[in-house]
């Protein structure tokens, strides 16, 4: 491992966005998203990366069984689409020296898009774990995470974040 990789690993957190049962089961085009998100979460945990769970404040006790917080992983209740505006997430990330974020969540066009843009705007390096994300509309999800779908779009997350898959989380953090 190079020194740069070690620094990336120790300054990286995983943000689990809106993985409440109701959201995962009703607002996802992809029935396999929970399994892949669980794999990505397990990889982050195994590597010792901090995991933050952000969900609407009314759903803080309604996590999908595969995606529930473990131990003392923080759960932040939000009142907006994104993870930053109505939580103390930024302060928590700064307190532990986080500079790089890996995001997964439902819905891609909601919490993932909003959180990615905010994180990018305030200086974080952002990686979107695209197969740990889903949207009610498969075409919208694809347009947001796959440059080849709509290459002229300024909406694509790939313009401001690196797209990865759940299998890559392990190598990114080791």
Predicted regions and their residues:
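Active-site-adjacent betaalpha module
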Residues: 1-13, 39, 43-47, 58-174
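Short beta-strand segments at enzyme active-site cores
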Residues: 16-17, 49-56
């Amino acid at each position: 491992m190079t020194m740069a990789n070690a620094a990336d690993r120790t300054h990286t957190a995983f943000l689990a966005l809106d993985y409440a049962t109701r959201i995962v089961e009703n607002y996802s085009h992809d029935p396999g998203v929970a399994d892949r998100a669980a794999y990505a979460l397990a990889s982050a945990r195994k590597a010792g990366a901090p995991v933050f769970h952000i969900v609407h404040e009314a759903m803080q006790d309604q996590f999908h069984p595969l995606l529930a917080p473990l131990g003392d992983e923080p759960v932040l209740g939000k009142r907006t689409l994104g993870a930053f505006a109505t939580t103390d997430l930024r302060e928590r990330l700064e307190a532990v020296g986080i500079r790089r974020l890996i995001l997964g969540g439902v819905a891609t066009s909601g919490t993932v898009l909003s959180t990615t843009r905010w994180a990018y705007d305030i200086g974080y390096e952002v990686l979107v774990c695209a197969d740990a994300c889903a949207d009610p509309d498969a075409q919208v999800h694809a347009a947001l995470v796959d440059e080849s779908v709509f290459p002229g779009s300024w909406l694509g997350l790939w313009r401001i974040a690196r797209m990865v898959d759940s299998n890559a989380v392990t190598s990114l953090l080791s």
